[in-house]
């Protein structure tokens, strides 16, 4: 790919699951996938918000299984690449192979930004069965550029075709993104692609995605109406508009994406996906975006300020998988007030 040709991956039906508490009907999945496919996106990711086998008490139960969602997507998909997400320790190689049997041809293997070594088995297994594989270094703001690049190099050594700067907390500024993508490019093989996964918590998702492309990223995550955890992901319709103005080459139809965002996705949201006092605090504190709904429930249950709860999550450096700690923090805050 040349410097301005991009690969647009939609995450409405994976990261967007967080925005609806992992509850979406199969007919809605089919409608959204068909619309995305017709609008020209390159890949469509489908899974529980926390990846294959993520449905649980800790992360939140899904309304359907991953397999039901994936089968519904595969039923109507004609052109785009069907993709999924896997977190080692949550999903297994068995689940990966089942997804492949159902038509998934690309997977992102996700770890915390300093734990790339735990992705080795899963990346290797995905390559062995013939999948396109990306490494997904979550909460990328928690590692400086040089350290993050070392982790990306590990994922490349295991066989990843692409490694992402994954701004799970929506905490990265444009300079932060530029520095991390440049650090990747300095150490990765020229054939290894770089991806950007942005969140809107600081209202920088489109800007950060554009900066990433200008610095060397090829794969860009985005979602209809920004449907995703926290304040959402990079809104695909806004990004495509800016991509057109910036001269990036892609195959997406802007108006078709606008229609799908407004007609199919916004009506599903039981809580507006937007920058507000709670989601802005996520980005400011550097907290995993999917903590939002968990923190709001805990704050309501124990009568604490959700912003103070999120700030303490940030101070403690909580990472994905530690959602249960949110209640402990809320109880600590209640105790501090009582004393």
Swiss-Prot record:
Annotated GO biological process: catabolic process; L-leucine biosynthetic process
Chain positions recorded as Mn(2+) binding sites: 15, 197, 199
Ranges where the Pyruvate carboxyltransferase domain occurs: 6-258
Feature type site, description Transition state stabilizer: 14
Substrates-to-products reaction catalysed: (S)-4-hydroxy-2-oxopentanoate = acetaldehyde + pyruvate
GO molecular function, one term: manganese ion binding
Top EC class, one word: lyase
Catalytic residue list: 18
Keywords for the protein's UniProt record, in alphabetical order: Aromatic hydrocarbons catabolism, Lyase, Manganese, Metal-binding
Keyword Manganese tagged: yes
One Pfam family per UniProt: DmpG_comm
EC number: 4.1.3.39
InterPro entries found in the cross-reference section: 2-IPM_HCS-like, 4OH_2_O-val_aldolase, Aldolase_TIM, DmpG_comm, DRE_TIM_HOA, PYR_CT
Binding site for substrate: 14-15, 168, 197, 288
Homology family: Belongs to the 4-hydroxy-2-oxovalerate aldolase family.
Protein known as: 4-hydroxy-2-oxovalerate aldolase 1
Classification lineage: Bacteria, Bacillati, Actinomycetota, Actinomycetes, Propionibacteriales
